From Swiss-Prot:
The keyword Acetylation does not apply. It catalyses: urate + NADH + O2 + H(+) = 5-hydroxyisourate + NAD(+) + H2O. This is FAD-dependent urate hydroxylase. Catalyzes the hydroxylation of urate to 5-hydroxyisourate (HIU). Is involved in the urate degradation pathway to allantoin. GO terms for biological process: purine nucleobase metabolic process; urate catabolic process. GO terms for molecular function: FAD binding; FAD-dependent urate hydroxylase activity; NADH binding; NADPH binding; oxidoreductase activity, acting on paired donors, with incorporation or reduction of molecular oxygen, NAD(P)H as one donor, and incorporation of one atom of oxygen; urate oxidase activity. Its EC number is 1.14.13.113. Gene3D superfamilies: FAD/NAD(P)-binding domain. Substrate binds at N178, R204, Y216, F217, F218. Pathway: Purine metabolism; urate degradation. Its cofactor is FAD. Belongs to the FAD-dependent urate hydroxylase family. NCBIfam families: urate_HpxO. The gene is hpxO.
């Protein structure tokens, strides 16, 4: 089939690679003139890694991934370790090591694998309509194209989603701002092989290793939306928000490069049931935009890619039937993880002070099993289990 994908993010690229593996002719159209990753890095948990392994990318993703052997929570104000444990039991349980990876490097790898010659930049879709067994897509430059299937991988502001649902879905602000970037690994920040998270006051500062001796860092602060966003003031702003925190966090803020640091107001969307309409189907954030609090946004987009490609391959009654079966497989799991991330977000960022304070106390008693079981419950249920 001739498949058009709108959006060249992780979901669109992974879907394109998967569909090409099954012999489809696939073209990706991206509205941006230049591909720029949203965020510095991503924690790619084992279910997402397995999806890339399935597509033959196991060596490539292993080269990009950091060596994350341990996990720790640290009191952000005192610097006291609350809990620290090995992730090896988790890795053995699910059968695959997780890989924190640079978003830019992951996106470049996926673009190379898909084929850059089939990615068209600066093409913004403005309208679509279905005609018999085809979909007509119109672009802002006046051009149009026909496809047998249209995959909407156009993110949290998806135009394709508006078409599928018949209405626009507004994003929900999650209540916190996230600053993220990359810094060199250094022992005065955190151990090199550990995901370390400093917590306190409903805020957090987190570091996880990616390839080439770098930490991916992020700092979260509960704030109202719409505040000033001036890169030149990032350091002094963060120093103000994290005043009185331990030396490791102060050192992180001092070392970050404001011009290479991203600031994101974190949002999600209310889960919905309809992932397709006729021959138009949604994947990734267009279908189930989530907060990053359980690290499953990119992983779920990759699961979508595998399920969609397989459903179109093995179900031969009709394209619509294959898309319906894709929806039935993906809807419950993806939407459940959106709500699970939302719940985790509220606890982490002190929506209820008593609940978050109780969580801090639980962390001091944690031996690792409870946290790992929670992560495992997010990982299992992927299409390759």
């Amino acid at each position: 089939m001739n498949v058009v994908i709108i959006g060249a993010g992780m979901g669109g690229l992974t879907t394109g690679i998967a569909l090409k593996k099954f012999g489809h002719q696939v073209t990706i159209f991206e509205q941006a003139e230049q591909i720029l990753p949203v965020g510095a890095a991503i924690s790619l948990w084992s279910n997402g890694v397995k999806c890339l392994n399935y597509l033959g990318l196991n060596e490539q993703i292993a080269k990009l991934g950091g060596q994350m052997d341990n996990l720790a929570y640290v009191d952000g104000l005192t610097g006291d370790v609350m809990t620290e444990f090995s992730l090896q039991p988790l890795i053995e349980e699910v059968g695959q090591r997780p890989y924190p990876v640079s978003r830019a490097e992951l996106q470049n790898m996926l673009m190379d694998e898909f084929g850059r010659e089939d990615i068209h930049l600066g093409k913004r879709m403005v309208a679509l309509q279905q005609k018999d067994d085809q979909v007509e897509i119109e672009f802002a430059d006046g051009s149009s194209i026909l496809a047998d299937v249209l995959v909407g991988a156009d993110g949290t502001h998806s135009i394709t989603r508006t078409y599928v649902l018949g209405e626009k879905v507004e994003r929900r602000y999650a209540g916190y701002v996230n600053w993220n970037g990359l810094v060199d690994i250094s022992s005065d920040l955190a151990p090199a092989d550990q995901w370390t998270t400093y917590v306190g006051e409903g805020k957090r500062a987190s570091l996880m290793p990616v390839a080439d001796n770098r930490f991916y860092f992020f700092l979260d602060v509960p704030l109202e939306a719409g505040l000033e966003n001036d890169k030149c003031k990032y350091k002094e702003t963060l120093q103000s928000y994290f005043k009185g925190w331990c030396p490791q966090v102060q050192t992180l803020i001092e070392r970050l490069d404001p011009q290479k640091t991203n600031r994101v107001e974190i949002c999600d969307i209310e889960p919905f049931a309809q992932f397709y309409k006729g021959r138009v189907v949604l994947v990734g954030d267009a279908a189930h935009s989530t907060t990053p609090d359980i690290g499953q946004g990119g992983c779920q987009a990759m699961e979508d890619a595998i399920y969609l490609a397989r459903s179109l391959q093995i179900n031969t009654l009709s394209v619509e039937d294959a898309l319906r079966r894709y929806q039935e497989k993906r809807n419950q799991r993806a939407n459940e993880l959106v709500l699970r991330a939302r719940k985790r977000c509220d606890v982490t960022h002190m929506k209820d002070e008593a609940v978050t304070t109780a969580w801090y106390a639980e962390l001091r008693q944690e031996k690792g099993l409870h946290i790992m079981n929670g992560i495992i419950s997010n990982i299992v249920g992927n299409p390759l289990d």
